Swiss-Prot record:
Its EC number is 6.3.5.7. The active site is at K74, S149, S173. It catalyses: L-glutamyl-tRNA(Gln) + L-glutamine + ATP + H2O = L-glutaminyl-tRNA(Gln) + L-glutamate + ADP + phosphate + H(+). GO terms for biological process: translation. This is Glutamyl-tRNA(Gln) amidotransferase subunit A. Allows the formation of correctly charged Gln-tRNA(Gln) through the transamidation of misacylated Glu-tRNA(Gln) in organisms which lack glutaminyl-tRNA synthetase. The reaction takes place in the presence of glutamine and ATP through an activated gamma-phospho-Glu-tRNA(Gln). PROSITE patterns: AMIDASES. One of its GO terms (cellular component) is glutamyl-tRNA(Gln) amidotransferase complex. Heterotrimer of A, B and C subunits. The gene is gatA. It comes from Francisella philomiragia subsp. philomiragia (strain ATCC 25017 / CCUG 19701 / FSC 153 / O#319-036).
């Protein structure tokens, strides 16, 4: 199943032009986003120009699969000539002089950029309540959060503002919002996609990801944005069609690992959805095997030591001098630094910078940062050992359905929202979230994790499931143009 391919057929047949399709999406955003607040910058003029170019390419018969397909980008991917804010006052007026590799690859495929999406400031958050531009609402219930940090990316696709969107995943920031908004989203293996031009949070964790309604669409998009990049030394080449190569193959004989201890304390409706999903995978020929996943609370602690440390280093560049917000009342250099950073950063960002500087202090380094890095290595080894027995590990994508705004203002409570997603980031492994059912009439998601560069196994597993048992058609009816 592929929404992209359905749009491709409409464009190629002449049923709709790229300009007409773009105008439909732009009109829907302008009409409906006031209540959702998913879009920071609407690129109407640029989008229509790109759509005109796409129509010319289609008329010449030189189109790719993605020519003329609209897309929205999380506002931490640099877009030449268009504001890139990272949802922060610090970058409120920053216009990137170049394109990120991710956005450039989309442009090169002929995609149409509709706009830039709201997010938690500098990708720090799990609710999308930490944005200089205001909180984002979940299209399923406007009083609830869409998840974070890529909440705008999830809400926009769920609302039907674009067929696909880009996001980033540092600790679950595409997978948890996908669960809350009824979408499929994937964080590929660390290094599969370039981080060049992506505003940094924690560089050894950050990875670009994709939101869509179907795993096939996510795979198509990941093929488009992945590959080698000379500007990112951590980016490795993956072969052409890496993510789509096995979509048509059945999954008979695949072994799914599950740690029952991670399921037993979940709400009853989510447990029921998990059980039904695993039963359906067994009907498709997969085998279920019990495994023991490393302690998730230790993973959470490890994550919230290392990532603030990396964030403190990365965000040191915002000093009010080179670019970004500058306090106009500072009387000397020291005051300029202090006032610009105090005013320019939001509370959650400042909290994580302070944690990061604390754990990196010479008196605390060995007790916190060094031990966390050692534990990261141990946990990665433990997870990789599990893959000697199984092809994928199944976990929930989130411990609950979307919760109400303001329910988790306590930082620790909010951090626990990522407890099931963080292991994939700690280990750099690929993981995909997909809808598995409903709890209290809201979507909930499951998640598969695989060993490094077995991304194709994840897209294969979920595509075969969605072709046979998925609930995406019901969800998509809420959003279809």
């Amino acid at each position: 199943m592929s929404y992209i391919k359905k749009l491709r057929a409409r464009l190629d047949s002449g049923e709709v032009t790229a300009v007409e399709l773009t105008k439909q999406y732009l009109a829907k955003i302008k009409d409906q986003d006031k209540s959702i607040n998913s879009v920071i910058t609407l690129c109407e003029a640029e989008a229509l120009k790109e759509a005109e170019n796409a129509d010319a390419i289609i008329s010449a018969g030189k189109q790719s699969l993605l020519t003329g397909i609209p897309i929205l980008h999380k506002d931490l991917f640099c877009t030449k000539g268009i504001k890139t804010t990272a949802a922060s006052k610090m970058l409120d007026n920053f216009v990137a002089p170049y394109d990120s590799t991710v956005t450039k690859n989309c442009k090169d495929q002929g995609m149409v950029t509709l706009g830039k999406l709201n997010m938690d400031e500098f990708a720090m958050g799990s609710t999308n309540e930490h944005s200089y531009y205001g909180a984002v609402s979940n299209p399923w219930d406007l009083d609830r959060v869409p998840g974070g940090s890529s909440g705008g990316s999830a809400a926009a696709v769920a609302a039907g503002f674009a067929p696909v969107s880009t996001g980033s995943d540092t600790g679950g920031s595409v997978r948890q919002p996908a669960s809350f908004c009824g979408l499929t989203a994937m964080k590929p293996t660390y290094g599969s996609t370039s981080r060049f031009g992506m505003v940094a949070f924690a560089s050894s964790f950050d990875q670009a990801g994709i939101f869509g309604h179907y795993a096939e669409d996510v795979a198509i998009m990941l093929d488009a944005i992945s590959g080698e990049c000379q500007y990112d030394s951590t980016c490795v080449g993956v072969k052409e069609n890496h993510f789509t190569q096995d979509l048509e193959k059945d999954i008979s004989g695949k072994v799914i690992g599950i740690d029952e201890s991670l399921i037993k304390d979940l709400p009853a409706q989510i447990q029921e959805a998990v059980s039904k999903t695993l039963d359906n995978f067994k009907k498709l020929g997969a085998e279920i095997k019990s495994v023991k996943v490393p302690d998730l609370k230790e993973a959470l602690s490890t994550y919230y030591i290392i990532t603030p440390a990396e964030a403190a280093a990365n965000l040191a560049r915002y000093d009010g001098i080179r670019y970004g917000y500058r306090n106009p009342e500072a009387r000397d250099l020291d005051e300029l630094y202090r006032k610009s950073r105090t005013d320019g950063f939001g509370e959650e960002v400042k909290r994580r910078i302070m944690i990061g500087n604390y754990v990196l202090a010479s008196s605390q380094y060995d007790s916190y940062y060094n031990k966390a890095q050692q534990l990261r290595k141990v946990m990665t080894d433990q997870i990789n050992q599990i893959f000697e027995q199984v092809d994928v590990i199944f976990m929930p994508a989130a411990p609950s359905e979307a919760f109400k705004k303001g329910d988790k203002l306590d930082p620790v409570s909010a951090y626990l929202s990522d407890i099931y997603t963080i292991p994939a980031n700690i280990s750099g492994l690929p993981a995909i979230a997909f809808p598995i059912g409903f709890a209290n009439d809201l979507p909930v998601g499951g998640q598969f994790m695989a060993k490094a560069f077995n991304d194709n196994v994840l897209t294969q597993m979920v595509t075969q499931y969605q072709n046979s048992y998925g609930i995406e058609e019901f969800i998509l009816e809420q959003a279809r143009i």
